UniProtKB/Swiss-Prot annotation:
Organism superkingdom: Eukaryota
Motif (Nuclear export signal): 602-616
Gene Ontology molecular-function annotations: protein phosphatase inhibitor activity
Protein name stated in the entry: Protein CIP2A homolog
Assembly notes: Homodimer. Interacts with TOPBP1; forming the CIP2A-TOPBP1 complex.
Coiled coil, from the record: 630-888
Its job: Acts as an inhibitor of protein phosphatase PP2A. Together with TOPBP1, plays an essential role in the response to genome instability generated by the presence of acentric chromosome fragments derived from shattered chromosomes within micronuclei. The CIP2A-TOPBP1 complex tethers chromosome fragments during mitosis to ensure clustered segregation of the fragments to a single daughter cell nucleus, facilitating re-ligation with limited chromosome scattering and loss.
GO cellular component, one term: chromosome
Similarity annotation: Belongs to the CIP2A family.
Single GO biological process annotation from the record: chromosome organization
Origin organism lineage: Eukaryota, Metazoa, Chordata, Craniata, Vertebrata
Length: 909
């Protein structure tokens, strides 16, 4: 069965089960859930299609029903957990279908049985849904959930304690209403004491969850000032970095990174971190985590490094750690080896920036953002020479990101590719701000790459659809416009350094397809995009063929479209409530409109026939014109009829959705009434509790004193642990020194033994060599006698050759006269070459000044090039003749000097 059939069978089974909750219907729903779970249709549910949306709505409604069977509830939670692994589906479940509130109700119903697996899986799914997302705290289910979490965290520790504490950390993070609600509870002091006691827990996950909740609730209060005071903050930093480096898993590392990022947003804590003496070594250990970790961990580490860049002093240290890793201490797991090139942070970052598009986490975008921050710090500190090697390593990867990809079908992959291109162009633009780094970029980047990138965005992103395109309709259109404008900005910075870049730059500026990206940039809400658009506009406005009028019309049309969208949105908000009651009336009016449209068409046909009968004497050409006009009117009426039909179908769908909304509104109204009753009861309880506050005040003072003593004892215990850790580090360093000394002495002993063996071998070889030399001495004495006889024969041959040399000297004199004549011709040719070079330099200067009008001067340029080639060919021929003469003279001189034998002279020359 295909996916659509499975989803339809699930909807049918759910409808039957809601009508009659029998075991057979429950088994049918259970079987449908198992089939869909086995198909792994995560990406299909992430789409906005109607059938998957109906399925998700059905699953949430079934889970919201308090009367369904527990095994069916467990299957529903398991399937939703599987679907929530996709980010888009998770966002839809959280925002569109309000799964958070529904799961809170499931937790409340299952809280009576703590061993129920539904409770554990629901809390884990809630933890995944609420991670890094603020939760709206209105509703009785959320209040009951917070009460259950706080009560269970303070109870006996079990397998639910860590998930409950993690979910509570999610709910408290960046959520002021929930923080206020927790602080207003009576048992908040004992809750703080429980969290502080968790800081000494053996599980690092428990420690980071507790510290995250404490930082969210108490960072700006008296308890937080004591906990994160200057005396204790360094121990807190050491604890967090220890969890980041040695965490129990990806989840623990994520929460510890988020905790450190939240603390960095506090200026006082950020200042403490800049003065933390072990920050450099901790940063080195964090950078080592980039090697061989899963994409989730790598992305969180990159987010942490980007958070460090928000503080200027920390960004300096991070830049030195990436570009100059030799100054960093090696981490504990590699203390006996030196840091190799493959484990340098720069190499790891380059590798992460080149991850494939199919990855679940886009580490490449984060790595490119980090490169931008590092290079900005390099340029601001004036230390660009230290980044040259890293730039040479990074540039091929950056240029590979700019390569136009093959046809990618998946829209998500296309979006990822475009985002990487934008970040890559940002990095290249930052490099062009410095002259030294700019030269490295200009050597590899070519004009053809930039032009092909822009043409690809024009062709495949739909941005060249013509004037009047609604650029705000498509996210891909926004990304394409951003790529085009930032590429042009990069070309404007490199137009004097890259050959052909200037001509290509001005040619694209006069292209009418540039109107849509410029319109998007100049009407954007982002300052950076507006500035880029203005820079491109200032470059393009003086050009003769720049379509300035079209740009103005496009900006006006885009502004009008935005204003129209705002008006429609306000009308939709105003008409949202009456729309539900008037859907049937609208659909009936649409049907009447269709009937009137059909009658109008018949009347037009009758008028056309009557007009033709009356005006028969008119020429055939006039009749054909009238026919064309009426045919156009008929086609427009037919298109209006189809649009009305589509509108009717949309109204019917809206009616069905309105029915579902009304059911949800009735449920919410019942919940609101129950909440009102609970609030009235709470008001009575509050009046009663106000009378008891005076009695509880003294008890709370005693508890606060006890908590103060507990905190002091914990601080003393932490100081003792710190001293033990320092002693342990000193012992480690001494053991490392002793081990290194032992290894050096061992190596020296081996070297001496090898040299001794080699010397013995050399002595034996010298003895053999001495005997062979004696034999050679006897042979050379005999050869000496033979060579003396041969010398006498050569003396006789020398006298014969001297006579031949005298005859050749006469020929040399004649050749010298010819050489002088050739020399004069050479001088004259050099003068002509100088003249031609001056003309060439003048032509080159004129070409640079008239680069914008290069198209009109191409004919003259080609003529000058032809003349130059002729002159260069003539000069080349003359040089060849001169080379021939010089070789002849060299041979003559060598013959006159007696360096060649008579047999080696080539008389053919």
């Amino acid at each position: 069965m295909d996916a659509s059939g499975c989803m339809k069978s699930l909807l049918l089974a759910a409808t039957q089960y809601r009508a009659a909750k029998t075991p057979s219907n429950a088994a049918l729903v259970q079987r449908s859930l198992e089939v869909i779970s086995g198909l792994k249709l995560t990406r299909l549910f992430a789409s906005n299609q109607i059938l998957p949306s109906e399925c998700l709505n059905c699953l949430v409604e079934l889970l919201e029903d308090a009367n369904i069977d527990p095994p069916l509830t467990l299957s529903l939670v398991t399937l939703l957990s599987q679907l929530a692994s996709d980010s888009e589906t998770r966002e839809a479940l959280r925002d569109t279908y309000s799964l958070t509130n529904v799961l809170a109700g499931v937790v409340h119903r299952s809280s009576t049985n703590l061993s129920d697996p539904v409770l554990l899986q629901s809390i884990q799914l809630l933890q995944r849904l609420t991670y890094n997302v603020p939760v709206f705290c209105a509703g009785a289910n959320i209040d009951e959930l917070i009460s259950f979490l706080m009560h269970h965290v303070q109870s006996t520790e079990d397998e639910l304690t860590i998930p409950c504490l993690g979910l509570l950390a999610n709910l408290c993070r960046h959520n002021l209403p929930i923080q206020t609600q927790i602080k207003s509870l009576n048992n908040v002091k004992s809750f703080y004491r429980t969290l502080i006691s968790f800081l000494a827990h053996s599980s690092l996950t428990m420690v980071v969850f507790a510290l995250s909740v404490l930082s969210s609730l108490t960072l700006n209060e008296e308890v937080g000032e004591k906990l994160f005071h200057a005396r204790n903050i360094h121990q807190t930093f050491q604890l967090i970095f220890n969890i980041v480096v040695n965490g129990d898993g990806t989840l623990t590392r994520k929460y510890s990174v988020d905790l450190l990022m939240d603390l960095l947003k506090n200026p006082k804590v950020a200042d403490y971190l800049t003065r933390y003496e072990h920050f450099t070594s901790c940063l080195g250990q964090v950078l080592d985590l980039l090697h061989g970790k899963d994409p989730d961990s790598s992305s969180k580490i990159l987010e942490l490094l980007l958070a460090f860049c928000s503080v200027v002093e920390l960004r300096h240290t991070l830049r030195q750690a990436i570009l100059e890793p030799s100054g960093l201490p090696v981490s504990g797991n590699t203390r006996f080896v030196t840091r190799s090139k493959t484990f340098e942070p720069s190499v790891a970052l380059v590798h992460l920036s080149n991850q494939p598009l199919e990855g679940s986490e886009d580490c490449s975008v984060l790595a490119l953002q980090l490169f931008k921050e590092v290079f900005e710090d390099v340029i601001s500190s004036g230390n660009s020479a230290s980044a040259e090697h890293f730039v040479d390593l990074l540039l091929p990867v950056l240029l590979d990101h700019l390569q136009t990809p093959e046809q990618i079908v998946d829209e998500l992959l296309v979006k990822k590719k475009c985002e990487r291109m934008v970040k890559t162009i940002n990095v290249l633009t930052v490099l062009c701000r410095d002259d030294i780094l700019k030269t490295h970029a200009s050597k590899l980047l070519t004009a053809s790459q930039c032009v092909s990138l822009i043409e690809h965005q024009f062709s495949y992103s739909g941005i060249d659809a013509g004037f009047g395109t609604k650029v705000v309709d498509s996210k891909m259109c926004k990304l394409a416009a951003d790529i085009i404008l930032k590429t042009l900005d990069l070309m404007s910075r490199l137009k004097q350094d890259v050959p052909g870049m200037e001509v290509s730059f001005y040619k694209i500026l006069q292209d009418q397809r540039l109107i849509t990206p410029l319109t998007f940039a100049l009407t954007s809400d982002y300052r950076e995009q507006v500035q880029v658009g203005l820079r491109i506009l200032f470059e393009a406005a003086p050009l003769p063929d720049f379509p300035a009028i079209l740009l103005g019309e496009s900006i006006a049309a885009n502004n009008a479209y935005r204003q129209q969208e705002k008006e429609h949105a306000s009308k939709r908000i105003q008409l949202q409530s009456p729309l539900i009651s008037n859907v049937t009336v609208s659909s009936s009016s649409c049907a009447n409109g269709d009937e009137s449209t059909a009658s109008n068409v018949q009347e037009l046909i009758q008028k056309l026939h009557s007009g033709l009968e009356v005006k028969e004497p008119i020429t055939d050409m006039r009749i054909s014109d009238i026919m064309d006009i009426y045919e156009q009117k008929l086609s427009s009426l037919a298109s209006k009829e189809t649009r009305l039909q589509d509108l009717l179908e949309a109204k019917a769908l809206a009616l069905a959705q309105a029915d579902r909304l009304m059911a949800q509104y009735r449920c919410q109204r019942a919940q609101a009434e129950s909440e009102a009753r609970t609030l009235a009861a709470m008001l009575k309880d509050a009046e009663r509790k106000n009378e008891e506050l005076n009695v509880l005040l003294k008890a709370q003072q005693v508890e606060s004193e006890r908590a103060q003593t507990d905190i002091e004892q914990l601080f003393q215990h932490n100081r003792k642990l710190q001293t033990v850790a320092e002693e342990h580090e000193m012992l480690k360093k001494s053991s490392v020194d002793l081990l290194q000394r032992y290894e050096t002495t061992e190596r020296q002993h081996k070297d001496l033994r090898i040299t001794c063996n080699s010397l013995n071998k050399e002595i034996e070889a010298m003895k053999k060599l001495n005997e062979s030399l004696k034999q050679q001495n006897d042979r050379t004495a005999a050869q000496l006698v033979e060579s003396e006889e041969h010398r006498k024969e050569l003396q006789q041959q020398l006298h014969d050759r001297e006579s031949k040399i005298a005859s050749l000297q006469q020929k040399i004199k004649g050749l010298e006269e010819k050489l002088k004549a050739q020399q004069k011709e050479k001088n004259s040719m050099e003068e002509t070459v100088d003249v031609l070079r001056k003309e060439l330099s003048k032509t080159e200067q004129a070409r640079k000044e008239l680069s914008i009008k290069a198209s009109s001067l191409e004919v003259q340029k080609s003529q000058l090039e032809v003349r130059l080639e002729e002159k260069e060919a003539l000069v080349k021929l003359q040089k060849e003749e001169l080379n021939k003469h010089s070789t002849m003279i060299a041979m003559i001189h060598s013959l006159s000097g007696g360096k060649l034998s008579a047999e080696a002279v080539n008389l053919s020359l």
